[in-house]
Regions:
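Short polybasic/polar patches that bind polyanions
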Residues: 100, 117, 142
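Acetyl-CoA-dependent GNAT
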Residues: 7-87, 91, 96, 109, ...
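Conserved acyl-CoA
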Residues: 107-123, 147
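Conserved active-site alpha-helix within GNAT-family acetyltransferase domains
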Residues: 106, 130-150
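Conserved beta-strand-loop-alpha-helix junction that forms the acyl-donor binding cleft
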Residues: 100, 125-137, 156-159
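Extreme N-terminal starter segment of soluble prokaryotic enzymes
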Residues: 2-4
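Conserved G/P- and acidic residue-centered "switch" motifs that form tight phosphate/ATP-binding loops
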Residues: 103
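Structural preference for beta-strand elements that scaffold enzyme active sites
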Residues: 87, 123-125
């Protein structure tokens, strides 16, 4: 299979947004189950619209890329730069489930690491959750060479 990473074009955005919905649905299902319906609705009721905006903004930022597998959109990735700290952060990324296991995620990370280096950064970072819904992301990031982490927890309560 021929894998190619290219700058995102407008024609790829809707496919990437649909992939984001597919990829993040289990995470938001977990949030709903954990937080309960009321708290979930307060915090994440419009998660799809927020995700749509985030994906659109990231992919059209000039730092957004699409992975093509034999010409078909198979994944996306975008990053941001913190010039002051010299850190590049992978913001969002996903691989279509039908293309998983082909090394596409690793190719996207390597591609973005090169871009981040070219922009003069000395460190790359990514954030993800510690819950089971984020376990595949954690495995992918560790495989990509992210070898240090700071754990965190976010608490909520009703008032």
């Amino acid at each position: 299979m021929n894998i190619k990473i290219i700058p995102c074009e407008k024609t790829h955005i809707e496919d990437a947004i649909e992939l984001a919905y597919l990829s993040w649905q289990p995470i938001y299902d977990y949030y709903r189950e954990t937080l309960g319906e009321k708290m979930f609705d307060i915090l994440y009721k419009d998660w799809k619209e927020q995700k749509r905006q985030r994906i659109y903004n990231g992919l059209t930022s000039g730092r957004g890329y699409i992975a093509l597998a034999d010409g078909q959109p198979a994944g996306f990735i975008f990053y941001v730069i913190d010039d002051a700290k010299k850190v590049g952060a992978v913001e969002e990324n996903a691989v279509n489930p039908k293309f998983r296991g082909l090394g596409i995620a690793q190719k996207m990370y390597d591609f973005v690491f090169d871009k981040i280096r070219q922009e003069g950064m000395v460190c790359a970072m990514v954030s993800t959750g510690l819950d089971e819904a984020h376990a595949p992301a954690r495995r992918a990031y560790e495989k990509a060479g992210f070898d240090r982490s700071l754990e965190s927890v976010r608490y909520y309560r009703e008032l």
